[in-house]
Structures are given as C-alpha cells and as structure tokens.
Amino acid sequence: GEKFVIIEFFKGLDISFKLDGMGKIFSGMVSVLWPLATLYAFSYMEHAAKKPVYFMFYTLTYAIVLGISFSANMETLYLFYECLTLATLPLIIQPMTKQSKKAGRIYMYLSLFGSALAFFGMMFLLKFTDGTEISTDFVSGGNLILLSQDQESLRFAYFLAFMGFGVKSAIFPMHFWLPLAGAAPTPTTALLHAVAVVKSGVFALMRLTYFAFP
C-alpha cells in the first residue's frame, strides 16, 4: 500500500502508516475479536467501579493496536508500542487489589526495560541509515542488510530491538508478568492474552525479523 506520512521530523525519521498484507491480517483479526471481547466486558463490568474510565482505556487500546497494525516503519511501531503500555496499565490495576497492583508494577517495570532495549536498538539503526538512501521502513524481505559496513553492530541492534519488543510477547526470560496479570478483570486478561498485547508483541517481532532485517 501507499505510505501516508503523518509527521516528518527529518529525512529518514517520520511517523507514517501503510497498509500491507501483514497489517491487513493483524488488523482484521483484531477487528473481529475485539467486538466479541467488548460484549463480554460490558456484561462482566456492569457493576464495577469507575466503569467509564475502564472502557475509555479499553477503547483507546483498540485504537493503539490498529496503529501498530498500520505502522510503516520502526519509529511508528515503537511509538504505538509504548502507548500500548500506558493504555493497558490502568486496565490491569483496575480492581486496585494488592495482587493487581503488584501485577501492574511488574508489567510496567518490564515494559520500561523493554522500551529501553528497543529504543537503543532503534537508535543504532537510525545511526546506520543516516546519510544513506536506506530507511527503517518495513519492506517485505527487509532492506537493512544493505547496511553492510558493520554486520556485527547490525546484529547487536537487532538483538536489542528483538528483546525489547519481545517483552509484550512474553518471551523467556521476560514472561512472568503474564501469569501475574491474571489478577486483572477477566476482560483485561482476554485482552492481554488473546487480542491485543501478546499478539502485538508477536506482530512486532515478525515485522522486525521479516520486514526490517532479512
């Protein structure tokens, strides 16, 4: 699909969207599952406290996941990936029990750690692409291998980004936040496991592996 630029900071760094085959599949899956999860959430949260606030973040999470689906490059993916942390944290701690607060803290700490890893990995890549015609746009098959001047550093950048984006996909050894998140309301755990967060993590890793690096 055609790339749609929202904000261009300078050449090679922009926030932009593009709808390709992989984005269509992921956004389509989310768009089918989300209304079903929402119908259940309405029933489950009928007598819950602060219900309007809960559903505000619930809906915001949907918009953010679509932003992840349509991200045209690593910078846009990173932005929405971090927004996903901020939008889902209130959903986890909503009951305000001791267990849910603990789950929220661990989720936030691990997410911030992953954010730092992904950020440094992305900065490495932006340094490599500076002054070249190669961008961090997602291209089928990847194009960053063309930055052949320092393959060791390129692999290190990939490792950092992979581990950073991998936090939300609950890959070992940063997986233990997911069982703890069971203290959240059931619609939230459905969101974390089946619809939004873990799937977004896997989607980000697939983008990184098959559409940025070869």
Predicted regions and their residues:
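Residues within membrane-spanning alpha-helices of integral membrane proteins
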Residues: K24-S27, S31, F55-Y62, L112-S115, ...
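Transmembrane helix-loop-helix hairpins at membrane boundaries of multipass inner-membrane proteins
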Residues: G1-M56, G131-S148
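Structural signature of hydrophobic alpha-helical transmembrane segments
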Residues: G21-S31, M74-A87, E152-V167, P214
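Helical transmembrane-bundle signal
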Residues: S27-A41, Y62-S69, S115-G121, S200-R207
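Short helix-boundary/re-entrant hairpin motifs in multi-pass inner-membrane proteins
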Residues: E8, V53, A103, F156-P214
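Alpha-helical multi-pass transmembrane bundles of energy-transducing inner-membrane proteins
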Residues: V53-Q149
